[in-house]
């Protein structure tokens, strides 16, 4: 199996700086290696997907959306910003970055009737949850909630 990194910004750094290693973002790993071994039952959540800016740059953002669509028939992509501004740990020390970047997220959540947000960056999830007014969790938690191992 490849190396799996459960934080997209860290994945981006490792992917760029260690080209000889097979490294997957958590969403890509789950799609390629875990999903085929699962029985998935869709949930009733209305899921809004945060495609972390670093995985978008690498062209790997489709994996998180694919996972969300396996788990729910009601999936929406965030359109009100390209980057949430949390910027790794900077959001802890300069929360204004996140607040300004995500100022329209609560309206977007309300427009879609979203009840849960998913991401692949734990620090982004903190700011997104505060700004959006709904829980944002790792997409791995959503997949776990909607699946069981095939027999």
Task: Set out the residue ranges of the language-model regions.
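Iron-sulfur cluster-binding electron-transfer modules in prokaryotic oxidoreductases
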Residues: 1-151
